[in-house]
Amino acid sequence: MRILILPLMALLASCSSAPLPPDVPPSYSEPPAVATDGFVSVTTSADIPLSIEDLRAFLLDTPFITFLEPTDTISPPIAEETLIGEWLSAGAVRRLQLEDGHYVIERVLENRPELFSYQAWVFTNAAARGVDHIYGVQRFIELGLKETRFEWTYNVKPKSALTAIFVGRQVPELTEFMNTGTQAMAAAAGATANVE
């Protein structure tokens, strides 16, 4: 019995430890098809006293990723490199370098005034063990002439039913990460409305 337990314990220990950042950034690889179900999803939102057009212009000048703050296990992006196309155009691909030295590759799926969606599928951090891909959606909902609801949904597609359990355990921290970034962006964007 001991012969079986020791390798199992070693395997579990290796799975729980965080991988080291790569020496070389990952290259582009073909993305999987975007799933239609089986996601673990988190949504956050904020109402901002700007029109959709003005809010989108603000985010063009000040990219949303600049408002993301680290949590205990989630590292925010600190740099980006466009690999294919022109970022924000459908089909464009970029590589994000995270604060902890890891990388994520993502692509634009759709970009309209009221909706921006993207897919992330290359991860060099621990997410690679349990996450197949992420389908992100940012909606811009008109509430009035000068008010927009920004709604951000993060749909995480686990690799299996087993990894879905572990992904589900990350929901509170993912919620904190998303809420903090969304509220910081909303405050900064809202402040521009007061100087118009």
Placement of each model-derived feature along the sequence:
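Residue-level preference for beta-strand/loop junctions
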Residues: 38-40, 88, 100, 132, ...
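Positively charged n-region of N-terminal signal peptides that target proteins for export
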Residues: 1-4
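Hydrophobic ligand-binding cavity/cleft-lining segments
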Residues: 16-83
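Solvent-exposed, polar/charged alpha-helical surfaces in well-ordered, non-transmembrane soluble domains
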Residues: 53, 57, 176-179, 183
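Hydrophobic/aromatic beta-strand elements that line small-molecule binding cavities or substrate pockets
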Residues: 44-46, 104-110, 134-142
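Beta-strand/loop substructures that line and gate deep hydrophobic ligand-binding cavities in soluble
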Residues: 120-176
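Glycine-rich portal/gate segments that line the openings of hydrophobic small-molecule binding cavities
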Residues: 67, 77-129, 183-196
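C-terminal motif of bacterial Sec signal peptides marking the signal peptidase cleavage site
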Residues: 12-14
